[in-house]
Amino acid sequence: MVKLIHTLADHGDDVSCCAFSSTLLATCSLDKTIRLYSLSDFAELPHSPLKFHTYAVHCCSFSPSGHVLASCSTDGTTVLWSAHSGHTLTVLEQPGGSPVRVCCFSPDSTYLASGAADGSVVLWNAHSYKLYRCGSVKDSSLVACAFSPDGGLLVTGSSGGDLTVWDDRMRCLHSEKAHDLGITCCSFSSQPLSGGEHGLQLYRLASCGQDCEIKLWVVSFTRVLGFELKYRSTLSGHCAPVLACAFSHDGQMLASGSVDKSVIIYDIGTQSVLHTLTQHTRYVTTCAFAPNTLLLATGSMDKTVNIWQFDLETPCQAGSVSDQLKHFIEDWSEEDVSKWLRAQGLEDLVDIFRTNNIDGKELLHLTKESLAGDMKIESLGLRSKVLRSIDELRTRMESLSSGIPDEFICPITRELMKDPVIASDGYSYEREAMESWIHKKKRTSPMTNLALPSLVLTPNRTLKMAINRWLETHQK
């Protein structure tokens, strides 16, 4: 389903970053160079390597058109190159001359962002090469940055562990502690969850860090409710700091690279591990998906870049996901269940589940009676959390088996929504179910159990349109 088709071994030091355009692959290294390869045969271009930087090159990024390549370095500069000739277009000097750790283009190629070790983040006009706006974070280095698919937001990650969200004028909208030991990378899915209609924008964001975790977030923005960054889930699998993460172009897969020398590929729909790749012999520092083909590049401190190819029939395509999830859970070993418990924050129950030989099949058949009576779990809170987590697994299996996208199902009724509304917790619900919840229950979020900031329910017209389109397609 995924196979190693080529290994590039031209760099003389650690590979720090790799990036695709529609026709080229760029790699950069601590050896001060950037190398360019053709995707047709992975031959290095005649004008490669690109040489200008006087110290290690940390990041490289293509403009959306693929015509311009940006690279940044410890030497305090971000260089723009012609990807097709190798000529230097301009050299952008970071204010203060601090080492530049990361750079990326906005989706419309208007801006280039560069983040530095002194915490500064600069928005450059990518056409005039002039400094447009500046921002900074306190007491941390900027180590990650990503533009939202519409270009309206820039998210940066710091060595202190904060995700910071900026608007297109570099005004700080939000800052949140995301990873206790520091962030290493962040990446937006290019496919919006919904958006464009009535001012609603919903995007998926991934972040990873020194805490060995990958976290998934939903970034939402409406003119009425403003901006929100909502934590959704944590992907487990790595046993050491995670240094890189990247979404596939269709948003259905996420790849990550780690200090544990492995690359893990996740199915975003089921949040299950699809593949674990262990060919690198040292830390995996970077990973990137190609925009138009099923290719993945991974780079490492072993000085190599591996190119992987996926079969056309990937597990993320419709018709196979439900079967995969069903087999994935029912075939879980006792150790898989232990990993799942830890991912749910239930590590205190690992020994109890092992003692009772709970594997995937047994997990799906647990009840409140068996948890209390047979397994002697006395805490009502723990029993409730276990049952809720198991219900989520069952529900995901059922919704996928029925073919209904999970985001179309009301979290309260677990039925297809007809009149979806956005509550102040950022989640969407069926209007009637949410109104009943508010009137009969405590005024807390059904998803987080936290107090609702407001009881206002905003029609989610974009989601309603998506549901109607899905119904029209699937009821023919």
Swiss-Prot record:
This is WD repeat, SAM and U-box domain-containing protein 1. GO terms for biological process: protein ubiquitination. GO terms for molecular function: ubiquitin-protein transferase activity. The gene is Wdsub1. Keywords: Phosphoprotein, Repeat, WD repeat. The keyword Repeat applies. Disulfide bonds: none annotated. It comes from Rattus norvegicus (Rat). PANTHER family: WD REPEAT, SAM AND U-BOX DOMAIN-CONTAINING PROTEIN 1. Residues 403-476 form the U-box domain. The modification Phosphothreonine is found at T458. It comes from the Eukaryota. Gene3D superfamilies: Transcription Factor, Ets-1, YVTN repeat-like/Quinoprotein amine dehydrogenase, Zinc/RING finger domain, C3HC4 (zinc finger). Residues 332-396 form the SAM domain. WD repeats lie at residues 10-47, 52-91, 95-134, 137-176, 178-228, 237-276, 279-318.
